[in-house]
From Swiss-Prot:
It holds the Pfam family T-box. One of its GO terms (cellular component) is nucleus. The gene is Tbx1. Binds DNA as a dimer. Interacts with DSCR6. Interacts with NKX2-5. This is T-box transcription factor TBX1. Residues 323-338 have a biased composition (Basic and acidic residues). It is found in: Nucleus. Gene3D superfamilies: Transcription factor, T-box. Residues 313-322 have a biased composition (Polar residues).
Length: 479
């Protein structure tokens, strides 16, 4: 596929995305914008011969009864038009209609969801844990697809945590929303064969509460609940593909991934579970690796985090390891993560882009496909990537997801209990940063985006987000 005038295409996409944010989704989106309530009319004395007030559903553009050319949908007003759209959803392109998605680490997401998942937001931006990872099926191996995520409010409420009852309570109406953002997977667009080849990880995605963020991070309001949405967009090669924008994407919602955005963890059980299940919470875990059961030792299960960062998006996982310089930088980033959240991230080189497709813990996943629904500059390399020095362990010739157990042993210390989830082994690979132009600070721009995919992505975009809250105390998420 040949792409030209990348900057102009990206500017066009940014404009179309912003213009499409307020448009209704073509399907039944429970988290989309709601139609304002119909007007209320004060009762008044009827005047003989005078027409009465129009019915509420007919406001404000209902034709008179029996008017020529009026249809059932028109006679019921805009609300019924939307209801008709729900009854007759847009027929999806066969390239996306057969796509299905499985959520990885579903058991871990379920455990967090039962407690009430919390995700840290900071001014500098913070990565999610658990990381959103999926396995894709049913794509056309030779067709091009883009993968993106956005976040929509679960409701219009603001919450507070009641420590005496260990529960979340409604604190009032939600804060004003700002135009939403979408996050593109850094390998977009790519062939369906590549996407289906291995597990896709959105470990570059960062959450922030900085309303003035210019790094393309997802802006959220602290103490509000959000639902992540995952979108598959077919890159339509037709010249008039804008006409089919609503047909060329498919949206998936996993309800177990919803969370409350916070500046510091409120529920101590969430804190404990994140420490126990996050292999990089080394400064806070109180168990000795020698006390671990054999099946809970690092390396006993496949990788959770990212690997195979290279210029070639379909590079083999048997590529050489990263350099000593990469390893030192990754270690320094992790050491910063072990400190207080208020310290924030160190300054990173601008326009840093790393390609990532990663394997993860296998597990069954449910999905809720929606018929409708929908970035910015990429953040620095994932803190979860811990690179080894070359030759630190045997090559990965036997299995692409097999990683040495020794990689995590030095991250653990003290004594007590084993973690409830196995900590995976990890072998890193060198990544190659790419300079990347920016066309709009509110959207992620990838050099391989054409107008066809832009139109489909714009149709898929329908989000709200923003936040501003003071930095919190300690937290243990990877950045």
């Amino acid at each position: 596929m040949h792409f030209s005038t990348v900057t102009r295409d990206m500017e066009a996409f940014a404009a179309s995305s912003l213009s499409g944010l307020g448009s209704p989704s073509p399907g039944a989106d429970p988290f989309g914008p709601r139609e304002p309530p119909p007007p209320r009319y004060d009762p008044c004395a009827a005047v003989p011969g005078a027409p009465g007030p129009p019915p509420p559903r007919a406001y404000p553009f209902a034709p008179a009864p029996g008017a020529a050319g009026s249809s059932a949908a028109e006679s019921e007003g805009p609300g019924a038009s939307r209801a008709a759209a729900v009854k007759a959803p847009v027929k999806k392109n066969p390239k996306v209609a057969s796509v299905s998605v499985q959520l990885e680490m579903k058991a871990l997401w379920d455990e967090f969801n039962q407690l009430g998942t919390e995700m840290i937001v900071t001014k500098a931006g913070r990565r999610m844990f658990p990381t959103f990872q999926v396995k894709l099926f049913g794509m056309d191996p030779m067709a091009d697809y883009m993968l993106l995520m956005d976040f929509v409010p679960v409701d219009d409420k603001r919450y507070r945590y009641a420590f005496h009852s260990s529960s979340w309570l409604v604190a009032g109406k939600a804060d004003p929303a700002t135009p939403g953002r979408v996050h593109y997977h850094p390998d977009s667009p790519a062939k369906g064969a590549q996407w289906m080849k291995q597990i896709v990880s959105f470990d570059k995605l960062k959450l922030t509460n900085n309303l003035l963020d210019d790094n393309g991070q997802i802006i959220l309001n602290s103490m509000h609940r959000y639902q992540p949405r995952f979108h598959v967009v077919y890159v339509d090669p037709r010249k008039d593909s804008e006409k089919y924008a609503e047909e060329n994407f498919k949206t998936f919602v996993f309800e177990e991934t919803r969370f409350t955005a916070v500046t510091a963890y409120q529920n101590h059980r969430i804190t404990q579970l994140k420490i126990a299940s996050n292999p990089f919470a080394k400064g806070f875990r109180d168990c000795d690796p020698e006390d671990w059961p054999r099946n809970h030792r690092p390396g006993a299960l496949p990788l959770v985090s990212a690997f195979a960062r290279s210029r070639n998006p379909v590079a083999s996982p048997t590529q050489p390891n990263g350099s000593d310089k990469d390893a030192a930088e990754a270690r320094r980033e992790f050491d910063r993560d072990s400190g207080p959240a208020a310290l924030g991230d160190a300054t990173h080189p601008p326009q840093l882009l790393a390609r990532v497709l990663s394997p993860a813990l296998p597990g069954p996943g449910g999905l809720v496909p929606l018929p409708g629904g929908s970035g910015g500059r990429h953040s620095p390399p994932h803190a979860d990537l811990r690179l080894e020095a070359p030759g630190a362990s045997e090559p990965l010739h036997h299995h692409p997801y097999k990683y040495p157990a020794a990689a995590y042993d030095h991250y653990l210390g003290a004594k007590s209990r084993p973690a409830p989830y196995p900590l995976p082994g990890l072998r890193g690979h060198g990544y190659h940063p790419h300079a990347h132009p920016h066309a709009h600070p509110h959207h992620h721009h990838h050099p391989a985006v054409n107008p066809a995919a832009a139109a489909a992505a714009a149709a898929a975009a329908n989000v709200y987000s923003s936040a501003a809250a003071p930095p919190g105390a300690y937290d243990y998420c990877p950045r």
